[in-house]
A protein has these predicted regions:
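Non-catalytic structural scaffold of enzyme domains
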Residues: 1-260
Length: 260
């Protein structure tokens, strides 16, 4: 297999990174993709930094052995804890991380109120705090830890009374004092954009960083001459550490999901 035809590999603690994969496929449909969900060890967001680093290294090793030409860490928590380590271990492979779309939100709403929904671990991580500090003088940035929200996505529960009750409770203070933008700081959360919109109404813009990740991947592949030059769409293969038919079926369903 030629280098250009080798897959771009994604990994996440479960299924949430499929939201990043979907955006990447829209930008680079000709590429081949391999998605690895580590649902056996989910969620990463409540684990220690050392645990997340060990799990991330194991996932990356699996993907490299499968022939990955680039790795996308499709998880904000793993990016915060392990991206530097992964780049040290694999200096010859582009390793792309994800981070909340805080910069574009602040640029669009200078002096505004920006709510960042993320896992408790992401909110606590030094990487996020440094990013927040970078823009503190340009906008009011509010971190909202959402423990348990990702599990709704992992169950495929993207709408309905339970998830909307959870979101209503979390977002109630920001309905009384509205925000200008809501940054989805976890790659699970784009699947819940419709549910969030139904609660907050048409006012705040909902933003995530998936498109920025896809564009960065395109730049890295172009720089290294590894863009696949083919007029036909590529393939998308799904793997999961649980190796259960149900979770692989859910992975494919999320890949095709459209919310209104």
């Amino acid at each position: 297999m030629q280098k250009q035809d080798q897959p771009v590999a994604f990994f996440d603690s479960g299924l949430r990174g499929i939201s990043v994969l979907r955006e990447t496929v829209r930008l680079l449909p000709q590429e081949n993709y391999l998605y690895y969900g580590d649902s056996l060890h989910a969620p990463y967001g409540v684990k220690s930094e050392a645990q997340i680093q060990a799990l991330s290294l194991a996932a990356a090793e699996h993907l490299v052995s499968a022939g990955a030409k680039a790795i996308v860490v499709a998880c904000n928590t793993a990016t915060s804890a392990a991206i530097g380590l992964l780049r040290q271990v694999y200096p010859d492979i582009p390793v792309i991380g994800t981070e909340p779309a805080l910069k574009p939100a602040v640029e669009k709403y200078p002096g505004g109120r920006i709510l960042v929904m993320a896992t408790p671990m992401t909110i606590k991580q030094e990487k996020f705090q440094a990013l927040k500090h970078q823009f503190d003088d340009r906008a009011q940035i509010i971190g909202l830890p959402c423990e348990g929200l990702m599990e709704f996505v992992e169950r495929g529960e993207l709408r309905g009374s339970a998830v909307e009750a959870y979101l209503t409770e979390k977002l109630a203070p920001y309905l009384r004092e509205p925000v200008d933008g809501i940054v989805l700081g976890c790659t699970h959360y784009p699947f819940l954009t419709g549910a969030i919109r139904r609660i907050v109404g048409p006012g705040p813009e909902i933003m995530d960083g998936s498109h920025g990740v896809a564009m960065q991947l395109e730049r890295k592949l172009a720089q290294s001459g590894m863009l696949r030059q083919c007029g036909e769409p590529g393939t998308a293969v799904f793997e999961n550490s649980l190796d259960e038919p149900e979770i692989l079926a859910l992975s494919r369903a999320l890949f095709r999901y459209r919310d209104e």
